[in-house]
Structures are given as structure tokens and as C-alpha cells.
Design a protein with these regions (language model features):
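CBM-like carbohydrate-recognition segments
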Residues: 2-43, 50-77, 81-91, 246, ...
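Hydrophobic alpha-helical segments typical of transmembrane helices
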Residues: 132, 196, 221, 329-332, ...
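A short, mixed-charge helix-start or loop-turn motif at secondary-structure junctions
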Residues: 14-18, 57-61, 112-118, 176-182, ...
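Extended ligand-binding clefts on enzyme/binding-domain cores
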Residues: 123-124, 136-237, 244-255, 267-314, ...
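Extended ligand-binding groove/face enriched in aromatic
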Residues: 43-50, 55-175, 180-183, 290, ...
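Start-of-helix signal in alpha-solenoid helical-repeat scaffolds, especially tetratricopeptide repeats
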Residues: 21-28, 68-72, 120-123, 127-130, ...
Length: 356
């Protein structure tokens, strides 16, 4: 079976079980666009155009943390950058300006609405902010947007970096004390950071003075993160705890970053190549069922716990759980598979779930 066909089947299954919307749905649109572009599939490319044409005016929008979601987020911006959508009257700049006007902390890092006083930031935001602003900047030829994309990624990663393990905490400012971070090293949270870093490394102009800093953070995170890969090829809900349950959506996001690092030559060596192949095969084997339903993806997770346990590793492990067909899984899995295809693994032996 073609690797990209598995990605399309995942999307179709997702589309059958629920309406694809909210930020995790927009991630699936982004991955559908990438898979269609790689496959050069006219029908899938048209599907992308039709889905994204509904944004912003013909969608029953849920609550969003970031205004770019109202315009289709990264999927819209990337599709325009790649020429999948050609619309001279596009509104990328309009929504980029709205993004830049959102609440910020004292260092200029975007906060959740109303959260600037406590400095409330989430690493999840990196995947929402940086790719959209980068592609909007490239399409609009606006250096301000490109710089903002890099600055937000760097700012979030530096603010939430745990130097003791070179991994990333999910959030800051949600435990009742300004500046106090969560204690976790959550798989999907580190994956969100990794996606933003990886997209910047691939598309940020190399002459940017910010490119080397992005590369340094990416390489440090890469070196740390592969140490914790389980024998199954997956990473765990709490990356640093060997007894924690495996978590598939974070694994898939991490694999996307590893794939870009390998393909661009930023990551070199057998250890990264082995980790990537082992991870994709683990995802195929343990997390994708025969009907393309999914397993082992953590439900929504926003600094879990109460009182003194809020934001602790214990809370991330005991108050959250993995769910069958969890909606964060689909776009993340598609990401990993698209990157496997780009790295030369264009076929999968479906019976054994091994890459060819």
C-alpha cells in the first residue's frame, strides 16, 4: 500500500466519524494539502480547495485561541504558498495583522486572550502561530510576518525550556503564580514545538538572522528527545517516565520533525535514521487499525490537575488518558506518513506494517 494512501484513508475515516473542524481539524486540512501535493492527485487537490474555500465566511466556527484559525490556519497559508490555491484577493495579511495584535507577555510572546497579566502561554501555540505567519509572510512578501513567525517559535521554546533534560514544559502561568511553569514533558506538547521548529527550518529563508537560533533549538530538542523513544518506537505521555503509557499523537508530531531534519540534512547519522523508521513502523503497527481508526492518542490536555497537583507530571499521567479515534490523532498521523513518503518510504507492507 502506498504510504500516502494510508494518509488519505486516515483523513477519510476522520471525515466519516465527525465534522472536521476546530484547531485539530485544521491540522488535518494542512496534512491533506501536503499529502495531495506530494501525490499530485487532482481530486485530492480539488478537495483541499473546496474545504478551504469555506473559510472564513461559510463555517460554523467554534471558539479559537488564535484568529488565523478563522481563515483556515496553516492549511490555507501553505496551500497559497504552494500554489494549490490561487486567489489574488486572499486575506492572509488581514488575519496575520490580527494575530500580531493579540495579547502578549512582557517579552512579546503571544498569550491566550486575557492571559498577559499572568504571562499565560502554551507550547501548543507554536504550531498555530509560526507556520501561518511564515507562509503568510512568504506569500505577501512581508518580512515583518516572517520575523514574527520565528520570534514566536523561539520565544515560546525559550520560555518553556527545561534545561535539566532539554525538553519543553507545556505551559506557564496557569498554576496560580505568575511565571510558574507546568512540570511535564508532555509528548504532544514537545511535538507541537517540534512541528513549528521543523517548518521554520524547511521554509524560513536561510539568510534570516533567526535561522541559526531555530536550528540550535531544534537540534538540542532532537538530541534529547530520541533518548526517550520506547522499544515500540513510540514516545510516552510523559516523555521522561519509562512506566508512562505510550502516546501516539505526540509520537507522530515528533516523527514529522525527525523526517524534516533528516531530509534537509540538519540531522545526520544512523541514530536519527533508525529512530525515524522505528517510530513510523511503531505508529503503523500499534496505532492504526485495519479500518484506519486510531489508538493511543491523548485527549485534550491543558495543564491538568487541581490545587497543588495542577500541572504536575502525576496529573498528566493520571488525569488524562488515551482514546480510540481521538481527534488530535488524524492530522498528526498524516504528518508522519507524508514525511515518511518524502524520505523515500513510499510503500508500506500493510500485513506486517513495515516500510519499504
Amino acid at each position: 500500500m502506498k504510504t500516502l494512501d494510508i494518509a488519505f484513508q486516515l483523513y477519510d475515516h476522520y471525515d466519516q466519524i465527525e465534522e472536521i473542524k476546530a484547531y485539530y481539524g485544521l491540522m488535518a486540512f494542512y496534512r491533506l494539502a501536503q499529502a495531495a501535493y506530494e501525490a499530485k492527485d487532482p481530486e485530492r487537490l480539488q478537495q483541499c480547495r473546496e474545504v478551504l474555500a469555506k473559510y472564513p465566511d461559510h463555517v460554523d466556527h467554534p471558539h479559537y485561541s488564535y484568529t488565523c484559525y478563522r481563515y483556515g490556519g496553516n492549511a490555507q497559508a501553505w496551500a497559497m504558498y504552494k500554489g494549490i490555491i490561487q486567489n489574488p484577493e486572499h486575506r492572509l495579511a488581514e488575519f496575520a495583522e490580527l494575530m500580531m495584535a493579540q495579547d502578549k507577555d512582557e517579552q512579546g510572546v503571544l498569550c491566550l486572550a486575557g492571559g498577559s497579566e499572568m504571562g499565560q502561554i502554551w507550547i501548543d501555540s507554536v504550531t498555530a502561530i509560526s507556520p501561518y505567519m511564515l507562509f503568510a509572510g512568504l506569500v505577501c512578501q512581508n518580512q515583518k510576518y516572517i520575523d514574527f513567525a520565528a520570534d514566536q517559535c523561539i520565544g515560546h521554546c525559550e520560555a518553556l525550556w527545561d534545561e535539566s533534560v532539554n525538553l519543553i514544559n507545556q505551559c506557564r502561568g496557569f498554576r496560580g503564580v505568575k511565571g510558574l511553569k507546568s512540570e511535564d514533558h508532555w509528548s504532544r506538547g514537545n511535538g507541537w514545538a517540534y512541528v513549528g521548529l521543523a517548518d521554520l527550518l524547511e521554509y524560513l529563508p536561510k539568510e534570516s538572522p533567526k535561522w541559526e537560533r531555530v536550528k540550535k533549538i531544534f537540534c538540542d530538542l532532537s538530541e534529547a528527545i530520541i533518548k526517550y523513544q520506547a522499544d515500540s518506537g513510540l514516545w510516552r505521555q510523559e516523555i521522561t517516565v519509562d512506566s508512562a503509557w505510550v502516546e501516539s499523537s505526540g509520537t507522530a508530531l515528533i516523527l514529522y520533525g525527525l523526517g524534516i531534519g533528516l531530509r534537509t540534512g540538519i540531522l545526520q547519522g544512523e541514530k536519527y535514521e533508525k529512530a525515524f523508521k522505528k517510530g513510523v513502523e511503531g505508529l503503523l503497527r500499534d496505532c492504526i487499525n485495519e479500518d484506519f481508526s486510531t489508538e493511543h492518542s491523548c485527549i485534550g490536555c491543558m495543564c491538568p490537575g487541581k490545587d497543588e497537583k495542577k500541572g504536575t507530571i502525576e496529573a498528566y499521567l493520571t488525569e488524562k488518558y488515551a482514546k480510540h479515534d481521538e481527534h488530535h490523532s488524524f492530522g498528526a498521523f498524516m504528518l508522519a506518513l507524508v514525511e515518511a513518503h518524502r524520505n523515500g518510504y513510499t510503500e508500506v507492507c500493510w500485513e506486517t506494517r513495515t516500510l519499504k
